[in-house]
Amino acid sequence: MGPRVLQPPLLLLLLALLLAALPCGAEEASPLRPAQVTLSPPPAVTNGSQPGAPHNSTHTRPPGASGSALTRSFYVILGFCGLTALYFLIRAFRLKKPQRRRYGLLANTEDPTEMASLDSDEETVFESRNLR
């Protein structure tokens, strides 16, 4: 048997995960500039509990960043869903019912009208007469 080929959805999922992980790794490991190529002594290793430590955290994100990308995207999607629901609610309540069109005798059943036949040779025509 030949090499196993990944299914397209699984392949797309792996590609999306790699692309999502790529910016995280790019922030942490910046390329060296030509001035940094010179050898320098390694920085002193300090304990995170010492007073000079910037923060006591196990997260690798910079101190200015808040939350993970997944949390932020969840809030963005939640906001879009909320705006969509608000749009449809406003549209439903502002929707005015169309006024009934009145077609004379068909819509006006309360008027006392009488239909009388007019005799003619070709066809029978009815005349509407109001009996008020």
Curated annotation (Swiss-Prot):
Location relative to the cell: Membrane
Membrane topology designation: Single-pass type I membrane protein
Biased composition (Polar residues): 46-60
Keywords from the named record: Glycoprotein, Membrane, Phosphoprotein, Signal, Transmembrane, Transmembrane helix
Positions where Phosphoserine occurs in the chain: S117, S120
Keyword Cell division among UniProt keywords: no
Primary subcellular site in the record, as a coarse category: membrane
Transmembrane segments: 73-93
Annotated S-S bridges: none
A GO cellular component entry from the record: cytoplasm
Residues covered by region (Disordered): 34-66, 113-132
Record: glycosylation sites: N47
Entry annotated with the keyword Mitochondrion: no
Phosphothreonine sites (modified residues): T113
Signal peptide, first to last residue: 1-26
Family stated for the protein in its record: Belongs to the FAM174 family.
Name this protein carries in UniProt: Protein FAM174C
Gene source species: Homo sapiens (Human)
